[in-house]
């Protein structure tokens, strides 16, 4: 019991630190007067643990399979050479155009290039994510990506975002330096909630990612639609998001938005080269792990 109390106190202290960080960030004119609240479970219930144990086994097997593909690639890249079967890039592989999974790009890498990477995953928890299996697959993606990164020693943080009466609600599921080894279970608390004020949420997570010393920083947003909150929508919200993407690119944050709903063209317009069209929801976990794998190289 004493040990549990210590762990809970640590989580409370962590949440307070995250809240202070959130309070100190300038979110821009589009979010003037909006408060950002950080939520994090201080303890994990047996219910969440049981839920995780129920859904996780096939997802963890998928993670392990993806990890096994990394090792020969890392060895190959220590020697330099051409990378093939990439999900995005500037150079098309003419021999791969027949492929239907989108891995049709190539890139040439020099030997000994830096491979260090930190990852942040931000998941839209707006009410519309409850339609169909959107939230289920987003949660599965978080489970796969968390295990994938932790097993390979890649620092990862995972947040969900929505809105509440006070403004923006951010849910901390996994932290870079979590001490209680229970973040995998916290992922099961992810659910559809209210609206989405993407810009403020993105800025917080991007700032969080920028505290990492790794040279490459990958921020993945999973969303099913445009921003939708009181006083924050349409062209103003789009301009805010484009500005955030551009600002953090200058700070070595690579932002990708994985679109999983019916609003794909609007998301494409906002994020342009950072847009990922996820046609089949069941492929979302694999696609996101491949994206991380690509930046690990």
Roles of regions detected by a PLM:
Residues 196, 206, 225-269, 278:
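VWA/integrin I-like adhesion module and closely mimicked acidic/polar interface patches used
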Residues 1-119, 133:
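Negatively charged
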Residues 109-216, 218-221, 257-266:
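Von Willebrand factor
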Residues 272-297:
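C-terminal helix of von Willebrand factor
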Residues 122-132, 184-191, 226-229:
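Glycine- and acidic
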Residues 134-138, 193-202, 237, 284-288:
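Phosphate/oxyanion-binding active-site loops and adjacent basic polyanion-contact surfaces
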């Amino acid at each position: 019991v004493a040990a549990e109390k210590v762990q809970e106190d640590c989580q409370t202290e962590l949440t307070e630190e995250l809240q202070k960080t959130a309070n100190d960030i300038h979110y821009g004119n589009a979010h003037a007067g909006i408060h950002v609240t950080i939520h994090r479970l201080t303890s994990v219930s047996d219910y969440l643990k049981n839920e995780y144990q129920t859904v996780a086994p096939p997802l963890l097997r998928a993670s392990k399979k993806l990890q096994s593909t990394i090792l020969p690639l890392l060895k190959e890249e220590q020697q330099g050479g051409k990378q093939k079967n990439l999900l995005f890039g500037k150079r098309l592989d003419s021999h791969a155009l027949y492929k239907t999974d989108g891995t049709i790009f190539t890139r040439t890498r020099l030997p000994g290039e830096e491979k260090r990477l930190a990852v942040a995953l931000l998941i839209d928890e707006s009410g519309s994510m409850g339609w169909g299996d959107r939230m289920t697959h987003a949660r599965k993606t978080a489970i796969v990506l968390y295990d994938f990164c932790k097993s390979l020693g890649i620092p990862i943080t995972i947040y969900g975002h929505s809105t509440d009466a006070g403004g923006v609600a951010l849910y901390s599921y996994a932290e870079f330096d979590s001490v209680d080894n229970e973040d995998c279970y916290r992922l099961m608390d992810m659910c559809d909630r209210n609206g989405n004020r993407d810009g403020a949420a993105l800025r917080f997570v991007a700032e969080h990612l920028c505290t990492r010393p790794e040279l490459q920083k990958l921020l993945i947003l999973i969303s099913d639609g445009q921003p939708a909150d009181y006083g924050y929508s349409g062209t103003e919200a789009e301009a805010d998001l484009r500005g955030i993407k551009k600002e953090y690119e200058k700070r070595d944050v690579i932002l990708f938005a994985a679109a999983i709903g019916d609003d794909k063209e609007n998301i494409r317009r906002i994020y342009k080269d950072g847009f990922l069209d996820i046609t089949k929801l069941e492929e979302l976990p694999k696609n996101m792990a491949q994206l991380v794998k690509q930046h690990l190289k």
